[in-house]
Amino acid sequence: MRALLWLVGLALLLTGCASEKGIIDKEGYQLDTRHRAQAAYPRIKVLVIHYTAENFDVSLATLTGRNVSSHYLIPTTPPLYGGKPRIWQLVPEQDQAWHAGVSFWRGATRLNDTSIGIELENRGWRMSGGVKSFAPFESAQIQALIPLAKDIIARYDIKPQNVVAHADIAPQR
């Protein structure tokens, strides 16, 4: 009985140490996250929303190729799984995607370094009879974009003036 109590006590002690707030137990080491440097700032400051100008399959192939990328791709009509629209994450948020190119916004350049990019499948604009017209965005696509954008904006504390379209940061492209 005494040995059992000793084992239970040891297990409780180890459990208490392992669950200490700010300490993360990793394979081969422990990570202490309780001390944050003040000389740091969040990398992400801008959310850039683009349209693809291509269909979904071409957009997916292009955005997973070697020359251009985006963090997210939302199809015109996202398929529903469990009642929720599916969105494709192509680049982890902590990694830089190549979606902004040569860009400028509110005094900052190289926006790929400080932004998250979302691509919306959409044919974009067409010229007809000398008139430029834009394809509308589907309601289902916008309904998928809203919770994703809200989540990103909240997590990175992105200011409203820093939620932009591609045309805002690179008007000539």
Regions found by a protein language model. Name each.
Residues 21-40, 46-159:
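Active-site-adjacent loop/helix surface patches within enzyme catalytic domains
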Residues 2-8:
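Sec-dependent signal peptide recognition
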Residues 15-16:
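C-terminal motif of bacterial Sec signal peptides marking the signal peptidase cleavage site
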Residues 156-173:
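Acidic/histidine-rich, metal-coordinating catalytic segments
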